[in-house]
């Protein structure tokens, strides 16, 4: 029997939700940002890349903010926006892809956590895929599972502490690099077009921008954190505030971390530092204590992000099951109103994926790249739904956001989402379609048993399922004949 709980469960305010957004966006990768950005670009190109990415992601962030205000009834937005705008099967497919993406993403956090521990306990956890690392990661999967089972509010409080814990080392890094900043060093080869014995030619501005934007476009995955948890928010306005606050805060930190080191070290020096490069930079600038601080920060960051995504990832199948597009069993809650079955199934799948890490690192890395692409259609569907709803007579034009503003925001958000999908790569997109097609049997099962059985399998749904199945078969053919290679 599905429990409705005795309380509403709406207990997450703007601060808790903003912590969710920041924690889900700022993971372990940020501690490698100085080297990642400097690897193939000068500081001028890096600044432009962040401006372009920031503008594009602003429209996606604002899409989520507007939708949370004009359609507060659509909680768990990523899934519900797609379902409301384009029907049950599209909603299911977006939710299914997002769920798979975050399952593998969480296992990625397990690998990064163990690899970060290797700094303190070498060589037992090297690479995050040794036997001790797999055992340690497996234990943490279930620790986080039981933390979230105790209640979303308690887990979000722990997450706020973790978010503060990982921001402190980053702020220290920013303060130190700002204090030691020298304009003369910063201006040296600003556009990356000077060749010296130590400084190779970095290429055209276009090539520099492309290489850096492949880094920046992934930096904002997680911006939807507050929207996904909106069913547990105190108010719709808290969701919008948290999304914009999280976006602005993260963008500021990203820019400062990427640019300030160029005032102390030259591009070729930054490009040659081993990751996590924030640790290497501080080791050069202030000594060993700086390196240790950054590695501690990395460990806290990964654990905090992992907890955030554990809360988020279980919410999608739980919400979809309540609407009849996932098997009904996923809607079962415990006494703390946590999505019990959804959490256990998600954690079990993560556990299986941990074994894949141990037996085949190459296969794991490929799977991580594929599932990373699967989150992007959710952004496009949300932006497209905003455009569609802005044309609807039910749009609240007397509210704070006019229909024209909503339409432009959605259009620009959709355009940027298409760019993200393109930048992700065709081969990974095709593999993602195969994984999306694997969800079809679950959708059919939900349609036969769910509360909305009468509305399932209309001509529109049959057509959509047929298209996805055809594209999946085409992708299998292209890979099997090596027309396209991973």
UniProtKB/Swiss-Prot annotation:
Gene3D superfamilies: Amino acid/polyamine transporter I. One of its GO terms (molecular function) is antiporter activity. Keywords: Amino-acid transport, Antiport, Cell inner membrane, Cell membrane, Membrane, Transmembrane, Transmembrane helix, Transport, Virulence. It is found in: Cell inner membrane. GO terms for cellular component: plasma membrane. The chain crosses the membrane at residues 12-32, 41-61, 85-105, 132-152, 160-180, 211-231, 242-262, 296-316, 341-361, 367-387, 418-438, 461-481. It is a multi-pass membrane protein. InterPro entries: AA/rel_permease1, Amino_acid_antiprt, APC_superfamily. Its main location: membrane. One of its GO terms (biological process) is amino acid transport. It comes from the Bacteria. Belongs to the amino acid-polyamine-organocation (APC) superfamily. Basic amino acid/polyamine antiporter (APA) (TC 2.A.3.2) family. Catalyzes the exchange of L-arginine for agmatine. The arginine uptake by the bacterium in the macrophage may be a virulence factor against the host innate immune response. This is Arginine/agmatine antiporter. It comes from Chlamydia abortus (strain DSM 27085 / S26/3) (Chlamydophila abortus).
